[in-house]
Amino acid sequence: MGMMQEFREFAVKGNVVDLAVGVIIGGAFGKIVDSVVNDLIMPVVGLVFGKLDFSNLFVVLGSVPPGTAMTLDALKKAGVPVFAYGNFITVAVNFIILAFIIFMMVKQINRLRREAPAAPAPAPVTPEDIVLLREIRDSLKR
């Protein structure tokens, strides 16, 4: 079997195709979760805690050159070490929401799998030679 034939068989197997579809849908779903976190949840969290923009929360760890604006971007461009925890808060909330949504989806899928009882396996077909041997045995008993 040639290498191309083996690759074709590998690529069209159900698991590989399912994985590819999952990655594509996961990427799109990640954008939806990012939007939910950034556009819906973080503004509410920011309103509760009095800070609407978490991306500019940071602690300066080094000396700031004179004339440098005290924004995260300006400090990073100036090479000042900063502990930028605001973006981490946003990413952590994003992860928690995504993990919870995936958990709920898996939970529902598992529930649906349990509800659908497996169809009983059909009785195995007795091979023809066994049937013939049984007939011979039964005729000898008479």
Curated annotation (Swiss-Prot):
Q: Looking at the keywords, is Ion transport present?
A: yes
Listed Gene3D superfamilies: Large-conductance mechanosensitive channel, MscL, domain 1 (1.10.1200.120)
Question: Is Ion transport among this UniProt entry's keywords?
Answer: yes
User: Topology relative to the membrane, per the entry?
Assistant: Multi-pass membrane protein
Q: Which UniProt keywords apply?
A: Cell inner membrane, Cell membrane, Ion channel, Ion transport, Membrane, Transmembrane, Transmembrane helix, Transport
Among the GO molecular function terms of this UniProt record, one is: mechanosensitive monoatomic ion channel activity
> Where is it predominantly found?
membrane
Q: Which family does it belong to?
A: Belongs to the MscL family.
Kindly provide the name given to this protein in its UniProt entry. Answer: Large-conductance mechanosensitive channel
Q: Which gene encodes it?
A: mscL
